[in-house]
């Protein structure tokens, strides 16, 4: 993935700059103050973590993987997905990623990016193990946990990633007890160990 291009692509493609007005598909915070004109290229660290999500999900969604641009913007509502006119972008607030990293580590940022990306993957390449009765947010949770399983964080990294997912829910998200089953399904269907997930969800793991 080129470090100097502001895009997260789940297929090998060069994206044009995102110009569509778009609709907020999911935001982990209020999007009322977002100013798209302040979008900037992502940091190298953010691109590297987005690359982990890319590597985790590409084998699953290929050949129907979505193409997503990644931007940073201080006015963004923590992190969000915007889509419209056949284009999509994930926008994150750099101060939010700094806060998450300091409190929860790299795996937490991977999980939050994967949740946003999961909305797009679910539209273009739905998996048979995803229950269509789940809400869009639960399906995105399942994809986030799938990515975590593929990234294979340490037990403590998984615990902290789940803690971050719980700490920063989308506005439309159901309660944590409703989210856990979808997260567990995504984790185990993508090769993760169910007992490890259960320990992490219970706040255990070293």
Regions found by a protein language model. Give the residues of each.
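Bacterial N-terminal signal peptides that target proteins for export
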Residues: 1-9
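N-terminal signal peptide c-region/cleavage motif recognized by signal peptidases
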Residues: 16-21
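C-terminal capping/extension segments of zinc metalloprotease domains
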Residues: 22-98, 128, 138, 149-206
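Extracytoplasmic/secreted proteins, especially bacterial periplasmic and envelope-associated proteins
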Residues: 48, 52, 108, 112, ...
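Short coil-to-beta-strand
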Residues: 84-92, 109-118
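Short pre-active-site segment immediately N-terminal to the catalytic Zn-binding motif
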Residues: 96-111, 130-132
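Catalytic Zn2+-binding segment of zinc metalloproteases
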Residues: 117-133, 147, 152
């Amino acid at each position: 993935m080129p470090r100097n291009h502001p895009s997260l692509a789940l297929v090998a493609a060069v994206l044009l700059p995102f110009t569509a007005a778009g609709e907020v598909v999911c935001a982990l915070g209020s999007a009322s103050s977002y100013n798209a004109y302040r979008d900037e290229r992502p940091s190298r660290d953010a691109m590297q973590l987005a690359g982990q999500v890319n590597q985790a999900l590409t084998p699953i969604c290929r050949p129907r993987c979505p193409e997503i641009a990644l931007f940073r913007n201080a006015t963004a509502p923590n992190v969000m997905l915007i889509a419209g006119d056949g284009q999509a972008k994930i926008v994150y607030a750099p101060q939010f990623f700094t806060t998450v990293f300091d409190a929860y580590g790299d795996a937490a940022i991977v999980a939050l990016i994967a949740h946003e990306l999961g909305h797009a993957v679910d539209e273009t390449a739905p998996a048979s193990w995803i229950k269509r009765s789940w809400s869009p947010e639960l399906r995105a949770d399942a994809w986030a946990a799938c990515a975590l399983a593929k990234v294979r964080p340490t037990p403590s990294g998984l615990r902290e990633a789940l803690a971050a997912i719980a700490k920063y829910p989308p506005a439309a998200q159901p309660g944590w007890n409703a989210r856990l089953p979808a997260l567990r399904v995504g984790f185990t269907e993508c090769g993760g160990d169910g007992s490890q997930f259960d320990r992490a969800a219970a706040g255990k793991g070293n």
